[in-house]
């Protein structure tokens, strides 16, 4: 059995209504009783995840912002990675040919330029929400990531624009079909999990991980046992065809797999 279990949240542990199911919570508690280290590896913000862990009384390590931050059980910052200020400036100030909304993250929270109530549906479980700002006045020195939310085809065209403008100065990935992220070079959940396992004196072979999107690719591909959700992005299955595919998040498939 693995010594550490790493879980993506959206599309993996969370059901389509963005809640954790009772079976899932019960399974997580049983893993802890068996001294398996729990790690939540997510694109969500550390502030939100710390709130969720507190509400559930769960002991878990946190990989948040798609690897930009790693926190210990006690909330100590173990690792940080920020976008270079010049990259953040270019992304924020450039006029992109897109209908997607832009969202900026730093240690203080989630920021965007206008109200988009529909996006808050994904945060009903925690109550976490964006803060409205003038994007052009955003401090550039501590931006963890920038993401664009919108139609997938539109985001695919935007991805080409971003590649042309940024070259090798940032890492671009889809954390969902409707969310394209701009991250620091070399920053991903797999790299962050490597940092965490070294801190814990473990190897990646000692880990199992579950995920559904392209931001899970490096993590799933590097651990001893990686599992792809039945509802995963087709691109993820194509990138990691050797990994087993389990059930759908709506059926709490992670819990079902771990208890059967």
Swiss-Prot record:
Molecular function terms, GO-annotated: 4-amino-5-hydroxymethyl-2-methylpyrimidine diphosphatase activity; magnesium ion binding; phosphatase activity
Pfam families associated with the record: Hydrolase_3
Q: Does the keyword Metal-binding apply?
A: yes
InterPro entries reported for this sequence: Cof, HAD-like_sf, HAD-SF_hydro_IIB, HAD_sf, HMP-PP_phosphatase
Q: Is-annotated flag, keyword Transmembrane?
A: no
Q: Which UniProt keywords apply?
A: Hydrolase, Magnesium, Metal-binding
Please state the Enzyme Commission number of this protein.
3.6.1.-
Q: Identify the cofactor(s).
A: Mg(2+)
Superkingdom of the organism of origin: Bacteria
Active-site residues (renumbered)? 8
Q: Which family does it belong to?
A: Belongs to the HAD-like hydrolase superfamily. Cof family.
Q: What exactly does this protein do?
A: Catalyzes the hydrolysis of 4-amino-2-methyl-5-hydroxymethylpyrimidine pyrophosphate (HMP-PP) to 4-amino-2-methyl-5-hydroxymethylpyrimidine phosphate (HMP-P).
Q: What is this protein called?
A: HMP-PP phosphatase
Originating species = Shigella boydii serotype 4 (strain Sb227)
């Amino acid at each position: 059995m693995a010594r550490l279990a790493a879980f993506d949240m959206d599309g993996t542990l969370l059901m389509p209504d963005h809640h954790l199911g009772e079976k899932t919570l019960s399974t997580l508690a049983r893993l802890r009783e068996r001294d398996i280290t729990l790690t939540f590896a997510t694109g969500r913000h550390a502030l939100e995840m710390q709130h969720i862990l507190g509400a559930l009384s769960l002991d878990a390590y946190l990989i948040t912002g798609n690897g930009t931050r790693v926190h210990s059980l006690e909330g100590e910052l173990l690792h940080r990675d920020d976008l270079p200020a010049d990259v953040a400036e270019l992304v924020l100030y450039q006029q992109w040919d897109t209908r997607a909304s832009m969202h900026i993250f730093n240690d203080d929270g989630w920021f965007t330029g206008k109200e988009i109530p529909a996006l808050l549906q994904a945060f009903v479980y925690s109550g976490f929400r964006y803060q409205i700002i003038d994007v052009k006045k955003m401090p550039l020195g501590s931006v963890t990531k920038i993401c664009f939310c919108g139609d997938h085809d539109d985001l695919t065209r935007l991805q080409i624009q971003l590649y042309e403008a940024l070259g090798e100065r940032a890492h671009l990935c889809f954390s969902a079909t409707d969310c394209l992220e701009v991250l620091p070079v070399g920053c991903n959940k797999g790299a962050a999990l490597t940092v965490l396992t070294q801190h814990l004196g473990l190897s990646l072979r000692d880990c199992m991980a579950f995920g559904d999107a392209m931001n899970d690719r490096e993590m799933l591909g590097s651990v001893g046992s990686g599992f792809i959700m039945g509802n995963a992005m087709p691109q993820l299955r194509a990138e990691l065809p050797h990994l087993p595919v389990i059930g759908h998040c709506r059926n709490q498939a992670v819990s079902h797999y771990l208890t059967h």
